[in-house]
A protein has these predicted regions:
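Conserved ABC ATPase "signature" region
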Residues: 95, 99, 105-122
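Hydrophobic anchor residue at the start of the ABC signature
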Residues: 140
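Catalytic Walker B motif of ABC-type/P-loop ATPase nucleotide-binding domains
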Residues: 151-155
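Conserved ABC transporter NBD signature motif
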Residues: 56-71, 199
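Conserved structural motif at the start of ABC-family nucleotide-binding domains
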Residues: 2, 17-19
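Helix-to-loop junction immediately C-terminal to a conserved catalytic motif
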Residues: 48
Length: 205
């Protein structure tokens, strides 16, 4: 479960978040929309502990964001421009991610994860030659590899073709059925959601 209360963030004189309150319950998919520049990505970065808020608080499974190790073990984040080590293969990138999260080998089935996102036949190719859509699929695999309880997806459909979009909708439905909390920033995705929130003027409604 993800909760945020009164989150604030400014960049210089511009206040992007003025007091954001939101809750995403376990087993719930929430769509977050808003104009470009409204602060959606900033909000997700704060919730993923990639940026610090200027004020307010947020918790993941009752752990405050300041408890970075616990929170990061529970969060899966996919940005709209996922980064990988281009000189490493898809499999090697996931193996590195598993090591960073100290995942036991018996809990990490990387081949099955790559197959699930349609990349098994490309798993030994360097990610530097992957298309944007393939990188997005690999990002989804990485996001789910450590079995997070909360998933934060920032424009995950943007680089995907029709098959990829269908796959992502299926994955999100599976995460929901697995009682995970899912917060998605997207436009016109056709995704089935439980609630839609709008970020405007620095607050969520």
């Amino acid at each position: 479960m993800l909760t945020a209360t009164g989150l604030q963030k400014s960049f210089g004189a511009r206040q992007v978040l003025r007091g954001v309150d939101l809750t995403v319950k376990d087993g719930e998919v929430v769509l977050l929309q808003g104009e470009n520049g409204a602060g959606k990505s900033t909000l997700l970065h704060i919730l993923a502990t990639l940026e610090r808020a200027d004020g307010g608080k947020a918790e993941v499974d009752a752990f405050p964001l300041s408890d970075g190790v616990e929170v990061r073990s529970r969060i899966g984040f996919t940005g709209h421009r996922p980064g990988f080590y281009g000189e490493l293969s898809g499999r090697e990138n996931l193996e590195l991610w598993a090591q960073l999260h100290q995942l036991p080998e018996h809990e990490t089935n990387i081949d099955a994860t790559l197959e699930r996102v349609g990349l098994k036949s490309f798993s030994n190719d360097h990610t530097g030659i992957y298309s944007r859509g393939m990188l997005q699929r690999l990002a989804l695999a990485r996001t789910a590899l450590h079995r997070p309880t909360t998933l934060l997806l920032d424009e995950p459909f943007a680089a995907l073709d029709g098959d990829g979009r269908e796959l992502l909708c299926t994955l999100i439905a599976e995460w929901r059925a697995d009682n995970r909390a899912v917060l998605v920033v997207a436009h016109g995705s056709g995704l089935t959601v439980d609630r839609t929130l709008v970020l405007a003027d620095g607050v969520v409604a």
